[in-house]
Every structure is written in C-alpha cells, then in structure tokens.
Amino acid sequence: MYKKVKIIHVDMDCFFAAVEMRDNPALRDIPIAIGGSRERRGVISTANYPARKFGVRSAMPTGMALKLCPHLTLLPGRFDAYKEASNHIREIFSRYTSRIEPLSLDEAYLDVTDSVHCHGSATLIAQEIRQTIFNELQLTASAGVAPVKFLAKIASDMNKPNGQFVITPAEVPAFLQTLPLAKIPGVGKVSAAKLEAMGLRTCGDVQKCDLVMLLKRFGKFGRILWERSQGIDERDVNSERLRKSVGVERTMAEDIHHWSECEAIIERLYPELERRLAKVKPDLLIARQGVKLKFDDFQQTTQEHVWPRLNKADLIATARKTWDERRGGRGVRLVGLHVTLLDPQMERQLVLGL
C-alpha cells in the first residue's frame, strides 16, 4: 500500500522555555512561560512542564494563565537565542539527510528513505538525532516515525516529552481504526463537533463513509478527511518549501450578524496569530496583513494592506471596512486573520538599506 518512504517528524519539547531553562538552571523546576507580562495583555507562546501541570498552555491569554498559576514566572522571550538553537538543530538534521522541511523554529519533517546512517533504520536515526541534539544543545526532542507525513506528526506527540513513537506500514490500519479524528492535523474543535454529531469519532468510522457524502457535506475538507482516514497522504517532504504566509481563523458554531461579535473574535484570534508568526519569523517583519470573512452562503472575501509589522488596530479597521462593504446582510460563519511574509530577497534588500 505504501511506497518505501521513511519520514521522521521532530518536535522540540517546549522549545522556547527549554532554551531559557538551559541558560538559567534556576528556572528549571519552577513554572515559567514565554510571552506577555503582568502589566500588559498578551498570549502565552510556550510553557514549561511545571507550568502545564497548572493548566497553562500555548496560545492562552496571559491573564488566564496567571489565574491558573499566580506564581508563574513570565519571560519576554529571546528570539535570537531561539533562532541560534534552531539553526544548530537544523545542521544536525543535515548530517543525516538533505531532505528537510522546516515547519517552524522547533519542528521539521525529515525524509530518511535513502539515508545510509544507522543501517537505514529510521527508528535508529530518530533516536540518534534526539541524542545528538541533547549532547550538543542540552535540549530534548520528541520524534515520530511513519510512512506518511501526517502520521509522523501525530506519532511525535505520542510519547512527549523526550520520547518517540514508530508506526510501521504494517501497523497503519490498526492504528487508524481507533485514531480520534481530532488528532488529524487540520481538524479543529468545530469540525470535530460536527463530525461527532454525525457519529464520526475515529478514522475507522470515516472509513465506512461514502466519499460523495463527505464531499457534499464538507467540500475539499471532506476529501482530505477521507484520505487521512485511509492513511493516504501524498505530500512529499519538500526541502524547497518556503513559507509564504501565516494565518489563524475560526469557524463559528452559529453565524454571527453583528460587528461587535466579529470584533470580539478578532481580539481572541490576534494573540494566536502573533504567537504563530513569532515561531516562524521572530522579528515579526511582514509584507502584508489581511482579513478573511466567509458568509452563510459559503462565499468568502479577503482584504489586505501593505504593512511592515503586525498591527492589530489596522486589522480591526480592515475587518470593519470589509464587514460594512461586502457583507450585504449575510451572516458570517468564519473570521480569519493572516499575514504574507516578506520574500527573502526583498528582506535582504531592506536590511542592506538600513
């Protein structure tokens, strides 16, 4: 069923917080989080495991995190240090394969199908990479090994922290039978709730469904859901991959009809956009930022502004203009925010010009 492909997904454990604890051992056993401050509103980028015991999580508003853990130590973040560590980790990957697809500073896909290291064993390569990262950077990583990308990503989360999980081609069918649909990358809370209302909780449930029905109900997402439930993922590890945008969106359980509701959603989405952008672009330089609205008739519209840095006030103003001019009385079922990243060549020109 599967091509002889060996994919590893490596995911660093609470990466930003781990770098801080490594560089300041006094932080190691106390709850810490990166992002926000006690004086200003913000969002948690990463929390260490002592903080997670109190319920503190990534993308959580700082105020909520402090309510859960009043003695939480908040750190502003040192993105130069994180980028330096990320570059070192990527260099370690390159010792084993040239087929590396970075997803952010702290995770990447590796295709080790043709690697001669460790007698060609992807399991042993993953173990050796994790050990090398620890030996050279004193940081831990988790890894997943599988014949397709989405399963490798799911597997890397199975034995966190500092562990790995392997799904061989022969084990895929049994693994999928009981895999919750919410574990599939791209299946959010709203989609999972709709699927559960249809009696679909696991990939095994979807395997019994008619593809045409899923396409009618969910469109393109229905096909992806059906394919993933069958273990199908045709995407190759793309070492030329250049991330062009970062976005975040929310599909509402019920359509909204008032601007105040839309503005409140943007206020909640913005910190998550800020967090995601910081993971891939710590200096936060961008080319454009914009908004997306999807209406109750499934038509959608986007509007963008040229803007050098992420700016919430401009996003809200752009969304208000879009709401007033393009909604036409329709209900809104999805609100999204996104940024377009600078082309590397253009960015170099800007830096040289400073």
From Swiss-Prot:
Pfam families: IMS, IMS_C, IMS_HHH_1. Its cofactor is Mg(2+). The active site is at E107. It is an enzyme of class 2 (transferase). GO terms for molecular function: damaged DNA binding; DNA-directed DNA polymerase activity; magnesium ion binding. Its EC number is 2.7.7.7. GO terms for cellular component: cytosol. Binds 2 magnesium ions per subunit. The record marks F16 as: Substrate discrimination. Residues 7-188 form the UmuC domain. It is found in: Cytoplasm. InterPro entries: DNA/RNA_pol_sf, DNA_pol_Y-fam_lit_finger_sf, DNA_pol_Y-fam_little_finger, DNA_polymerase-Y, DNApol_IV, IMS_HHH_1, Rev_trsase/Diguanyl_cyclase, UmuC. CDD domains: PolY_Pol_IV_kappa (cd03586). Its main location: cytoplasm. It comes from the Bacteria. It catalyses: DNA(n) + a 2'-deoxyribonucleoside 5'-triphosphate = DNA(n+1) + diphosphate. Keywords: Cytoplasm, DNA damage, DNA repair, DNA replication, DNA-binding, DNA-directed DNA polymerase, Magnesium, Metal-binding, Mutator protein, Nucleotidyltransferase, Transferase. GO terms for biological process: DNA-templated DNA replication; error-prone translesion synthesis; SOS response. Mg(2+) binds at D11, D106. Monomer. Poorly processive, error-prone DNA polymerase involved in untargeted mutagenesis. Copies undamaged DNA at stalled replication forks, which arise in vivo from mismatched or misaligned primer ends. These misaligned primers can be extended by PolIV. Exhibits no 3'-5' exonuclease (proofreading) activity. May be involved in translesional synthesis, in conjunction with the beta clamp from PolIII. PANTHER family: DNA POLYMERASE KAPPA, DNA REPAIR POLYMERASE UMUC / TRANSFERASE FAMILY MEMBER. Belongs to the DNA polymerase type-Y family. This is DNA polymerase IV. It comes from Shigella boydii serotype 18 (strain CDC 3083-94 / BS512). The gene is dinB.
